[in-house]
Amino acid sequence: MYRLISKYQADKILQMLKEELKEAEGALEGKVDWKPLPEKKESKVYAVDGSQGKARLSGTIIYTVASFAFGNGKSARLVYTNAMTYNHGISDQIIRLQMETLENKLGALVGNEEHMILMDGTLTGSLTRPPVYPESVKGITTLLDTLEKGKPEELIRDFVERLDEHYLDLEKRLAEERELYSGVILADEVIDEYSEFYKAMEGRDIVNYDGALKRLRDALKAEIPRSEIMKIAEELDEYTELKTLTLEEARNTIHVVLGYLEYLYSLEKLLQRELIYIAKSFYNRKITSKLGINLLDVPFIDAYLVKTHGKELPGYCVIYDPERAEEKKKIAHRLPRILRKYFPTVQRFIEIGVPSAYIRTMEGGIIYLLQSNTSINDELIAKLLWHESNGYIRPLQRAHEGVKIEQKAFRAELEALMNYLKKKDKELRVFIKYGRSPLE
């Protein structure tokens, strides 16, 4: 067995870390408002997590996405299995979008007003990096450019009204069954009912400005003279791409937009609940950037606590509260203007930012990033701590264990599905052979 790390490399890493520690120690005069943890307060929660499994076959992806809720009450589950023709650009993003949509739906519907909802990850991530966002915005722009005036609004309004009914149906079925395996993703079910829109788009010319905008952005970043920028702007036509929409492209555009609308609707509904997002993997510099040091927040906090208290104390530190901050930390994401009135809560958090804090629940334990849709204070922390044990938030652990799609189980079900399809029609073998990458 050959060695992966030489002594030279180990010493180099050692030196780098020592330099970072020295830099942190030099800035430790900067105060970290590390508050002691409050006493635990009894509360009810549901924790929600999601999972996905997918198999890339010859030209087809067969996939399953699921969400699972565990907490003070009966657990609940949403599962969706589907197949799509592989599109290198966005297939994986669509699958992730549907998984996150199921997580949001379950979080919005499970339990009652007494339950806090615990989500894995960050709310800023849901707001800033929704999967297929560039394709979704491009799709909405295409709708506005190719449909008659008023038609894009008609499509959006109609689908949102369908989602209203869809949620009432989901809520009723969840109360009765607790595990739903059909009728959980609306966009895929109703896409063909919007054929009048994508047929009207067929044959229309659209202009792709991606290349032109990149050239203009690069010029602006380079801070070249205004006269040069104007010259580039006059020549931008050379970097645009004109194309005529096929029926399939028009249908795919509508489909992506519907999926994005369903995701935004699920997030809007989720934001009506009392939420806590918990992330254990993050690379923030919220505190250190203010102090002008090139170090992540977590090691800096640990260095500060060891220097001032002699140990890695449990406690928490609020790093952003939009109710108190003079300057709002807007989310680096914008809803297309046509959508803002349909998702006002999503739009509000994009504009004001997300309440955030760091927390450690036991001495020497992990520092988590907390985010919420309400101010983070002793009251909220006390209710969260009711569900903490040995540094971990147990309901989230159980939700993660309950939703995980095991490789062996997915392989078995995939094999059964492929055998069923081949039995029904032997010619389908061309789509379902050469399987690879069964689980992610």
Which sequence ranges carry the predicted segments?
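Acidic, metal-ligating active-site segments
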Residues: 50-92
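Short hydrophobic beta-strand that contains or immediately precedes a catalytic carboxylate
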Residues: 45-48
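Long, contiguous domain-sized segments
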Residues: 1-43, 95-440
